[in-house]
From Swiss-Prot:
UniProt keyword Coiled coil, yes or no: yes
Segments for region (Disordered): 1-55
Species annotation: Xenopus laevis (African clawed frog)
The protein, known as: Axonemal dynein light intermediate polypeptide 1
One Gene Ontology CC term in the entry: sperm flagellum
Record lineage: Eukaryota, Metazoa, Chordata, Craniata, Vertebrata
Keywords linked to the UniProt accession: Cell projection, Cilium, Coiled coil, Cytoplasm, Dynein, Flagellum, Motor protein
Amino acid sequence: MIPPADSLLKHDNPVLISKNTERKSPKSRPLKVSSPQTVLTAPVPPPPKPKTPLLDATKPAEEILNAILPPREWVENNQLWIQQVSSTPSTRMDVVHLQEELDMKLQQRQARETGICPVRRELYSQCFDELIRQVTINCAERGLLLLRVRDEIHMTISAYQTLYESSVAFGMRKALQAEQGKSDMEKRMADLEMEKKDLERQVNEQKAKCEAIEKREAERRQVEEKKHAEEIQFLKRTNQQLKAQLEGIIAPKK
């Protein structure tokens, strides 16, 4: 017989319940299987807040322990085994041994000392269950109060876990959106870079054309100025000749 995984919660020795789980007893009740629910398009409401079961502290300790810490059941070689939580009172040495075993398991399973660590949480939960078991045996009322504290802690952790998963999903969506936006911006930058190079090429072409036009106009202006200067000189010489001829004609009459 191989018992289930070892736990810090103290259990009694396993008890064989059924030697053949495949053989159906005529008095056994069939298992109730819930029919699959119709898929609804409406959003599913959040699960209700878990409540600690109402237990009567006057009941026997074993009954209370089985209610707050259910027995472990497993099947091996078609045999059903059950292992209930121990109802043996604990001593001071048991508490010391529990602390030593907790430290040993934390070290063996390489639990992280800080931050979120599922291994550390599991071991401390087992240790807390064992403390609840020890307290419940001595004082049922105190044990039930610790049970409420445990359930409240579990509910708070579950709420934080849901919030964390939601935050991670939101962060991933934002990261994907940012990555998509980054790709779009990179494509836009590449297009603008190509457009810039094309505009620079056009500017260089226009500059070259402008320089050619300026050079051609400068040459043409020089030719025109030279031509005008020659015409002025020609007109001046002609004027001097005409003036001299006119003076030669007028002078003898005096």
